[in-house]
Amino acid sequence: MNPTELHMMWMSSQYNAANNMTLEDATALLNHPTVGLLEEMSGHHHQPTLEMNPMMGLVGGDFNGHAATLSGTLPPGTLIATNSNNLYSFAHLGGLQHQLLQQSAAVAAFQNYTEVMDADGMTVGLATDPHGELMDETCDDEDQVYGHQIDDGYDDGGAGLEPKQEIINIDDFVMMNEDNNSYDGTDFMTSSDKDISQSSSSGLTHMQGGGVSLGVAGAEHDLLVPLGDGLMHHKLLGATLAPAMPLNVGNSNVFGNIMVTGADPPSSKQMKGYRNSNSSGTSSATVTTVASTAVMRAQRKTRKIEPVNRPGLVLKTPIAYKGNIDPSVIPIQKDGMAVCERCGAIGVKHTFYTKSRRFCSMACARGELYSLVLNNKMETTGATTSNNQSTSSSPLPAASGTSLDVTEDALLASDQPQSDIELDLHAAHIKNANYRFRITDQSKITQLNSFGEPMSLGGDAAAHNVQMAADETIAALNGAAVGDAAAPGGEANGSGNDTSTPNTASSGYLSAAPTPKALRLFKDVYPQDDLPQIPKYERLPAPCPQMEKVLSIRRRMYDPTHSYDWLPRLNKENFNAAPVTCFPHAPGCEVWDNLGVGMKVEVENTDCDNIEIIQPGQTPTSFWVATILEIKGYKALMSYEGFDTDSHDFWVNLCNAEVHSVGWCATRGKPLIPPRTIEHKYKDWKDFLVGRLSGARTLPSNFYNKINDSLQSRFRLGLNLECVDKDRISQVRLATVTKIVGKRLFLRYFDTDDGFWCHEDSPIIHPVGWATTVGHNLAAPQDYLERMLAGREAMIEVHEDDATIELFKMNFTFDEYFLDGKTNGFIEGMKLEAVDPLNLSSICPATVMAVLKFGYMMIRIDSYQPDESGSDWFCYHEKSPCIFPAGFCSANNISVTPPNGYDSRTFTWEVYLRNTGAVAANQHLFHRVVPEHGFETGMSLECADLMDPRLVCVATVARVVGRLLKVHFDGWTDEYDQWLDCESADIYPVGWCILVGHKLEGPPRVSYQQVAKPAPKPKVPRKKKTKKGASTTGGGAAKQQNDNTQTTQTVKPRTIALKTTPHLPKLSIKLELKPEHHNAAFYENNQPEDGDGDEEDPDPDADADLDADADGDGDGSTSHISEQSTTHSSSDQILGSGSGGGSTSAPVVTAATGSIGGNSNKMNSSATSSKYIPRLADIDASEAAHLELQPDSWNVYDVSQFLRVNDCTAYCDTFSRSKIDGKRLLQLTKDDIMPLLGMKVGPALIISDLITQLKCKVNPGRARSHKTNKSSYL
């Protein structure tokens, strides 16, 4: 196979060419040279970034790896004091060069953190000496102990462990082994560490003399202190310096981070002196920590996550692999895989951070926004850095005065407008429009004192507060409790020797309250809870899919969709519904195993004094606890708690707005009210419920969120795709998604208003570019064809509204055929058995007519006469579950439909193959893996009628043969059964229709069948009725009838119109009904017993019926009675349908003549003549010719009668007043009709289509020509 034939943009996410092909092959594939991977990797130290997978990036794949290299030469030392929330960035910027250099694996762990450049080009990174070399100071034993005290200050016990909110020690944060294939991190910290980890608001500057100076960094930020242990360890201090910040210091930088620089780091002796000047109790505090150091290091080892070592798999974090790994070897399903946009790590999407699951860790999420804003503010930060550096040359005793200078500079810097902050953040969001970090309202960023008033510190007060903050810092470092730091005078240090802080400072410090947590410059995105949790008051659960928008189905007096109600059958003992888990595509299938009998829920209480009339948008106010007794499909039988009998048991859909998990009422402030019948049964209902609910199970708190997510379609309105042409099944046609109901799509063809319904997982829809890729016939606009043909030489130009391959479900991957070199084992001329796509109730011998690419092939059903044009071919994939080896039917006792010219009683494959000289396809070519689907004979379900796919009907599993199901439509003969695969997207659990808001067609009534027995028409052989499979829908009223017009008997069977679908209600003349009568019961109770119908006066409400739903999309749940008059019926045509037409009915003939129906002659002809006035939905062309249909001889009254018998009674008078006779009627166009009807588009389209049908009945050749013109393709 020539690789250049597969330049498809929509295939890019399916394979990883870079890891399976040589560079020469990649060059041939992409038609241009690619990046040399080995050359780039060998020279990676010369580049800050490297594209690890350039070919995938060129093709458009999702897996991009990035690597960052460590700078070999570092400029003089520069240090950044950063927020503890940004600790991943701090790990790179804070000076831990020894860990990074000694452990080579850490380079990959921190590859996403490149050097941050300031305005002058100076690199901000690891601390260095003035000569640009890494600093490696030594220290004495005491200094080393002091450093380890901070690093390993863990408690021996593990009882106080709790999830980390802010990580403090970098040693505890990440440890990489030498094999670079595992990750060591500390997932918990003790409560004492957490106290120290509270964010603060101070920064630290290094001074040339080795001294240190405290600088104000901003609210909720931390102080970076060198440990002086020779390893360049640093420590972030706790929330003890927060009160020392002036009012608006934080405004000088977006995140309050102060950029400070220094010459030489403080020596260990100076650090020791600095500690001793503040406290004499250091030794005891530090020595006690030495013993726990080794113990806690051992404990951290026991908490290490041990990954499974596989060849070629290298972990980046505990939940993600490195980005330069071939995704095909990673043991993660493609639909559950995600790639970190920050570092390129690949992992499970559910474990990623942010709502859109775009980062592998919170560090990547925070670091991205941090770096974006920091780069924008670098110029301002550089100015602040130089100011801080100029003020950091005085020795340690002048710390107070120096701090005051820094404070004044910071105050001056904070005078910039607040709009600068908003502008910077806004610019960051513009550059990364997909980032969804929440920014706190700037108006709330105001520091308050203990009295709730804005703080205004300045002059000496600020100096005293800074000095007090310094004392508190030293106290915290020496082991003093954070709470003790607030004590006056020497008590804060524990020894009483400190006299540097006067009482005024203490009092000033006590008057300032710490900055509230809410006063942060931004908030992080909350990670999703891994396990279902009971919702808390401050975070209510998301509403269920129909929450507060759906009427109570148990008390609904009027159902606008007139759907079939399962309730009468649910109460039968022998009723068996297929479980929801049998339908992989059904909403909630993945969480349905969590539900079970005995589970407690809160449901609406309908047994109360005042039954509420719930309107859309309202929620019931009365609820009570109930127990699930039985589950059938989406329906559940429940009993209120407190009833001892089943007298008040009720059925309810588990996925509607009435059912909630226990505790939902408490979160909404709704009381639990016991049913009125038993309200006096117990004195204390609270104790009763406590006893019943103790140890009971309830719905997961995220149950409705899961249901809602599974209801979301992958498609959107306006997308273009390629789908089977229902008028010519051997070609695909460009169509547009115009409606979506429960993941079912209504596709409208590009050149007509016609279309059909199908599920988004259906195999008859394909992505843009599919036809030109596999070699299938395509009907599309000229510009589309040119774009697709151009894509065969280069990549397809993808438009915004193109449906790409990731939206479609397939049971194979293109990798198998392109990368692995797999070929199609089928060859032309092979014989097999297949489900007839035009008659799903039969399995027939078939012939492979053409072999396409990627496993597709065109087959022809041998039961029909051959069509030289090939219009009867149909495309199947070699892995399709609807094709079988020769002899499959006989081996499974299935009646096979014989080939054309053979008798079903004498047909054998041996004779057939010998007569045709063909070869049967080998059995190993078929994929007949049978999953544990769970279907059994007799199970009830809801199934789409694929002969008219806009209808979803009540059905039963009649037979199970491996993975093949024979679905029987209840109330209809076996002639209308369908053979479907167990994983077909056209079958649904009981209750699916009401869940998604789709109409459910029920079985016909016996009484209604008995009515429909006027003189029968000649029966057409079965095989001539199978054109119904051309995906005919209840589509556009204006054009569908012309597609389905019955031709004469001389036409070849494969070109006849489509057969009748059983699930459409048949209408009599009496159709002008008020909306409240539009239901099945009305028709059943008001049907004349003799089958005749009398004329009825024009009804004023008929206008509304004719106006409604004139767009012709065939949506059965929204259409009205008038649409039934526009869709037609003959012995081989589909009957019109609508919500006003009741559930179902058998075919009936209301057009009457003396030879067809004697009693109805008065309805269909003039009272003064014997002219034949037909009801077009009930005759075919041969009958019209036999009855001498002559509309050009009609008078005005005959035209009025024609409109009346064809369900347009409301406009009879209009045509009569306009003196429209037969000749004038045949000359009318849509533009002529609209002014007559008051510019009503819907009725005009309906009557225009009636006229077109009438012309076709008069001239059958015109009908064939009309249909041929509609089916033309490029």
Swiss-Prot record:
Q: What are the subcellular locations of this protein?
A: Nucleus
Q: What is known of its domains?
A: MBT repeats have unique discriminatory binding activity for methylated Lys residues in H3 and H4; the MBT repeats bind mono- and dimethylated H3K9Me1, H3K9Me2, H4K20Me1 and H4K20Me2 but fail to interact with these residues if they are unmodified or trimethylated.
Where are the annotated FCS-type zinc-finger regions? 331-366
**Which superkingdom does the taxonomy of this entry point to?**
Eukaryota
InterPro entries recorded for this chain? Mbt, MBT_dSfmbt_rpt1, MBT_dSfmbt_rpt2, MBT_dSfmbt_rpt3, PcG_chromatin_remod_factors, SAM, SAM/pointed_sf, Sfmbt_SAM
Q: Key word Mitochondrion present in the record? A: no
Spell out the Basic residues composition-biased ranges.
1019-1028
Where is this protein primarily located? Answer: nucleus
Q: Which keywords are on file for this protein?
A: Chromatin regulator, DNA-binding, Metal-binding, Nucleus, Repeat, Repressor, Transcription, Transcription regulation, Zinc, Zinc-finger
This protein's assembly is summarised as: Interacts with pho as a component of the pho-repressive complex (PhoRC).
SUPFAM superfamilies found in the cross-reference section: SAM/Pointed domain, Tudor/PWWP/MBT
The residue ranges of the SAM domain are 1194-1258
Name the gene behind this protein.
Answer: Sfmbt
Q: Provide one Gene Ontology biological process annotation.
A: negative regulation of DNA-templated transcription
Query: Compositional bias (Polar residues) at which positions?
Result: 267-278, 494-509, 1117-1128, 1158-1167
Q: Which residue windows does the record flag with biased composition (Low complexity)?
A: 381-394, 1038-1050
Q: Could you give a GO molecular-function term held by this entry?
A: DNA binding
Q: Name one GO cellular component term.
A: nucleus
What this protein is called in its record is Polycomb protein Sfmbt
Species of provenance? Drosophila pseudoobscura pseudoobscura (Fruit fly)
The record's function comment reads: Polycomb group (PcG) protein that binds to the Polycomb response elements (PREs) found in the regulatory regions of many genes. PcG proteins act by forming multiprotein complexes, which are required to maintain the transcriptionally repressive state of homeotic genes throughout development. PcG proteins are not required to initiate repression, but to maintain it during later stages of development. They probably act via the methylation of histones, rendering chromatin heritably changed in its expressibility.
User: In residue terms, where are the MBT repeats?
Assistant: 564-675, 683-781, 789-899, 907-1003
In which residue ranges is the amino acid composition biased (Acidic residues)? 1087-1114
Q: Which residues does the annotation say bind Zn(2+)?
A: 340, 343, 360, 364
Q: What are the boundaries of the region Disordered? A: 266-285, 381-401, 488-510, 1007-1063, 1083-1167
